[in-house]
Amino acid sequence: VTSYTCMDLFSQETLLRNAEKALLDLVNNTADLDLLTIVGCPLVSGSQLINAAVAFQRGEILGVVPKSYLPSYKEFQEERWFTASSHLQQSMITIGNREVPLDCYLIFEYDEVRVGIEICEDLWVPIPPSSELAMQGANLIFNLSASNELIGKHAYLRSLICQQSARCIAGYVYASAGFG
């Protein structure tokens, strides 16, 4: 809903309030579609800000998946703004007037598909959340990303995605704001 480039604007209440409003508009405007939709959005859980993926269908938010691994090297400073899933104090989050599950290991069922979600950096760690999601029965993993562009990174990323898909015995859908 917002952009990864918001950086210090993530601490602005106006940005967070309007991001949640835009998210609720998306949920409401797709209520007549039988489509599982996943969008990224910064959300406040208690007093903690999370980089999250929100899954919704037919006007209902099904759950929120917080990012597990926050990079804090080179140009990445996510720990400055966000809280990692392992440090969250709640397992539910209120969006608008709806209380929904909040967990990095949620699985969403859509027809015959069991969908798991991870966010960008989560794929790059030794044991990604998608590995656990696959062990719990997910057969399709979505990764929401806003990865930067570096020479040679695309080939490495493509290889990483193919390897993780094979390890999980699952389809792996990688959607980035950049190339690919």
Residues of each region from the PLM?
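Enzyme catalytic cores with a strong preference for nitrogen-chemistry domains
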Residues: 1-180
